[in-house]
């Protein structure tokens, strides 16, 4: 965070995604562009297992996926912790992630059955009280062995249809409680509410990291996000969203043609897949 104007994070739900993020680098003028780390998304973790995004996949299962990624990559991983669960359980989650080398967890200030934030007010979204969520942050911070692991608070006020002022009140309280950063989330396609939040937050906290997930306001360039005061941008679900349509096309082609030849245009050559992972040949 201190070394770059903005940190670029991409979703990874398995080791192959991790390898792409680890190794992909492109030339842009005089500079090289690459990803700085990975996002372990609860949405893509659960969807890739054929389960709903309601915290149905437990920590033990998610850690197995994370270990697969950790075995073949070196870049930092941010863990999507959903609501964090009960305070008593959250402390064990923090210890497990810290012990296994994960860099940070982001938890959202909601209670009850988790529903994906991008449903907005179309699904029941119940926010925790400020005091209740602050207690969770404090408990997590007290459970840490080192100062390296980050606990980042995700503020759902805008998702719940509340004003920016509510999001700011919560953000200030969470930082006071010990949060190492704040993530502000919104379903608004313009991004204007995010911009308003960032400028207001920066007036009080010029150095506390701000995290955004521009899934709905994807037209905004990283340079502009940086000018708002954003430190970390997470592309939270794009690897799975890219993979699923390609798999459906290949499967549909085989059904339509009763052979695999036509599906070849959607597939990489078999020789390349055999040589993709070092040690296979």
What do these predicted regions represent?
Residues 1-234, 242, 252:
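Alpha/beta enzyme core
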Residues 16, 238-281:
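Extended, intrinsically disordered, low-complexity segments
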């Amino acid at each position: 965070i201190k070394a770059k104007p903005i940190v670029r994070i991409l979703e990874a739900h398995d080791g192959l995604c991790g390898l792409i993020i680890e190794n992909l680098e492109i030339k842009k003028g005089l500079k090289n562009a690459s990803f700085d780390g990975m996002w372990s998304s609860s949405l893509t973790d659960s969807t890739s297992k054929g389960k709903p995004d309601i915290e149905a996949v437990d920590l033990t299962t998610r850690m197995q996926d994370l270990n697969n990624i950790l075995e073949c990559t070196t870049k930092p991983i941010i863990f999507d912790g959903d609501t964090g669960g009960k305070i008593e359980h959250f402390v064990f989650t923090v210890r497990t992630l810290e012990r296994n080398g994960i860099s940070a967890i982001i938890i959202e200030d909601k209670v009850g059955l988790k529903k994906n934030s991008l449903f907005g007010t179309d699904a029941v979204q119940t926010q925790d009280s400020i005091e209740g969520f602050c207690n969770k942050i404090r408990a997590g911070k007290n459970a840490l062995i080192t100062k390296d692991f980050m606990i980042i608070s995700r503020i759902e006020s805008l998702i719940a249809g509340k004003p920016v002022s509510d999001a700011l009140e919560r953000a200030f309280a969470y930082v006071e409680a010990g949060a190492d950063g704040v993530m502000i989330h919104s379903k608004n396609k313009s991004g204007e509410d995010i911009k308003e939040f960032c400028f207001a937050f920066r007036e009080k906290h010029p150095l506390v990291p701000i995290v955004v997930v521009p899934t709905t306001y994807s037209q905004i360039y990283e340079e502009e996000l940086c000018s708002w005061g954003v430190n970390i941008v997470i592309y939270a679900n794009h690897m799975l969203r890219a993979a699923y349509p390609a798999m459906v096309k290949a499967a549909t082609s085989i059904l339509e043609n009763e052979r695999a030849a036509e599906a070849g245009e959607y597939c990489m050559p078999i020789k390349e897949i055999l040589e993709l992972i070092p040690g296979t040949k």
